[in-house]
């Protein structure tokens, strides 16, 4: 499996590129789409909530427990996004996995995206059924903007420890 990666092993430039790679990430009251550095502070707050998250003060989103003891969150809708997506069983998709990469097994409500339509084998690799999300179709330039990150991401899928700090937004403060 991949070696454990502690918080101090994340350098700022790499984190910036990694966040770009693991997009889109849905979060916030209206399920807004986050794909730039300015939103990292909001992401950090959104992904640091307790096990029950409340949106607009009216809804509570509770985590489900995976058979292996880690926790995932049920996705039944994403704000005003025009689709529904639901995690099945104990499996995780790209965005769920991205959150684990940043050092938490408490995956946030609203983090969901499909595997790229051109990479059904990725879905098989991650143990999930291949599917597409709503009307959103991602091309390689959008989903994999950095050469090599597509393959490199697989390194984090095996034996990856989640016992490290969350990537902190101040790391990106002066990145353009």
Curated annotation (Swiss-Prot):
Top-level taxon: Eukaryota
Which keywords annotate this record?
Answer: Seed storage protein, Storage protein
What GO molecular functions are on record for this protein?
nutrient reservoir activity
Q: How does it assemble?
A: This is one of six apparently different protein chains that constitute the peanut protein arachin.
Protein name, please? Arachin 21 kDa protein
Q: Which organism is it from?
A: Arachis hypogaea
């Amino acid at each position: 499996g991949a070696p454990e990666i502690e918080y101090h092993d994340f350098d700022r430039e790499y984190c910036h590129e990694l966040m770009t790679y693991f997009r889109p990430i849905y979060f916030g009251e209206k399920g807004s789409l986050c794909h730039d550095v300015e939103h990292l502070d909001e992401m950090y707050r959104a992904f640091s909530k307790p096990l029950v998250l409340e949106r607009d003060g009216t809804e509570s989103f509770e985590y489900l427990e995976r058979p292996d003891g880690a926790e995932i969150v049920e996705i039944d809708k994403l704000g005003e996004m025009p689709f529904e997506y639901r995690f099945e069983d104990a499996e995780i998709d790209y965005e769920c996995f991205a959150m684990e990469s940043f050092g938490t097994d408490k995956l946030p409500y609203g983090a969901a995206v499909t595997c790229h339509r051109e990479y059904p084998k990725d879905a098989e690799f991650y143990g999930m059924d291949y599917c597409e999300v709503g009307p959103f179709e991602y091309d390689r330039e959008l989903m994999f903007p950095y050469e090599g990150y597509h393959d490199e991401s697989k390194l984090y899928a095996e034996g990856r420890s989640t016992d490290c700090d969350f990537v902190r937004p101040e790391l990106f403060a002066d990145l353009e």
